[in-house]
Amino acid sequence: MVHEVLQSHLAAIKNGSAPVNYEINSWQDLEQWFQAHLELQKRYKMTRGCPFGTVGNELTENDGLIRQDLGHLFEVVKHKLAMFFVREKAQGRLVKDANEEHLAAFCIATIQGAMLMGKIERDGQTVEIAFREALMHLKRYAVTPKS
C-alpha cells in the first residue's frame, strides 16, 4: 500500500498536480515552494512533518522497495530544483562555481529538517526561520548578469 501511495505522489510531482508546485522557474517560485511546505504543515496544525520524510524515518532493512520509491521521488524533486539552478547559471545569474545538485540537495534537507522541527515544536516559527535563512544563503549564489 505504501508503494502505491508513493507512486501516486511521484506521478503528481511529475505531472504538476501535487499540492506543492515543483516547477521552479524563478526565485519567487523557489520562495513559494518553501512557503507551500509550511502552509501544508500549518493545515495540520503543525502535527505532521513531510509525509515522505515520515515514511523514510520508518524504513527498516527489509523495506527495499519503499526505500527505492523514496529515493526515486527525492531524485525527481532534486532534479527539478537543480534544473532551476542550472538555468540560472546558464543565464549568468548564478556564480560559476555553484554546484546545482548541492544547492538542490540543500533545499530538500532544509525542508525535511525544518518540517521535523516544526512538528516537534508544534510551531511554524522555526520552519519560517529555517526557510528564510535557507533562501538568504541560496541568494548569495545569485549574481547580476554581465551585459
Give the ranges of each region predicted by the language model.
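An amphipathic alpha-helix adjacent to DNA-recognition modules
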Residues: M1-A18, E31, L38, K78
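Short, solvent-exposed amphipathic helices
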Residues: E4, L65-V76, M83
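N-terminal helix-turn-helix DNA-binding core of bacterial DNA-binding proteins
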Residues: V5, R43-Y44
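Amphipathic alpha-helical segments used for helix-helix packing
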Residues: D29, Y44-L65
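C-terminal peripheral helix-coil segments that are non-catalytic and often amphipathic
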Residues: Q32-L40, E75-Q91, A105, T110, ...
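A surface-exposed regulatory interaction patch that couples sensing to output
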Residues: M46, D69, M83-V95
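Membrane-interface starts of transmembrane alpha-helices
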Residues: K96, E100-A104
